[in-house]
């Protein structure tokens, strides 16, 4: 399941984020690469311990946890703190699958979901599409600044070469309360239907029944 969430941050907020990011010292992006990815990855990143990156990453996590569509789709249990990357001058990241397990200051997490928050407007760079291959085929993603895409970490994906301009983004992984992608998709679809019926002022008893089904499925499938 691939979910696009528009306007997680406003244009003004993105501009403020970029002012802070652009002033920092960027390093070789292979800092977070797995062994096989190092030959495919050419980009720049902020050090994960950079104080500005840490503060902005926390701001992103706080915003996402307050975003109903994100919470409904991801059912987040634990984040790998957001990182920041930059592509320019032909830099790229060839096809790869994200590492299944990552270490955080609080221990290990299983990477169920990956997310990219775009921080450059698409018209400001050529190339740089996030291309994701999943069960529904190949999808090419290039969203407006402040928008986010969420997708299974098991997906084969790449960032195509940035031929001109500059592509800046935040990226992150998270462990979901529900490990299985198919189960997460069903829960998301059910929750979205409940929200739609609530807005349409559907019969209270039917909403009560559907909400009960949702929570009982979540109770059955979640791992905490």
Curated annotation (Swiss-Prot):
KW Transferase (keyword) present: no
PROSITE patterns named among the record's database cross-references: FE2OG_OXY
Binding, Fe cation: 96, 98, 157
Keywords attached to this entry: Dioxygenase, Iron, Metal-binding, Oxidoreductase, Vitamin C
Binding site for 2-oxoglutarate: 167
Molecular function GO terms recorded: 2-oxoglutarate-dependent dioxygenase activity; iron ion binding; L-ascorbic acid binding
Fe2OG dioxygenase domain ranges (all copies): 78-176
Cofactor note: Binds 1 Fe(2+) ion per subunit.
InterPro entries, alphabetized: Oxoglu/Fe-dep_dioxygenase_dom, PKHD_C, PKHD_hydroxylase, Pro_4_hyd_alph, Pro_4_hyd_alph_FE2OG_OXY
The keyword Oxidoreductase belongs to this UniProt entry's keyword annotation: yes
EC numbers for this chain: 1.14.11.-
Domain of life per record: Bacteria
GO biological process: DNA damage response; intracellular iron ion homeostasis
Necessary cofactors: Fe(2+); L-ascorbate
NCBIfam families assigned to the protein according to its UniProt record, in alphabetical order: PRK05467.1-3, PRK05467.1-4
UniProt name for this protein: PKHD-type hydroxylase Sbal223_0741
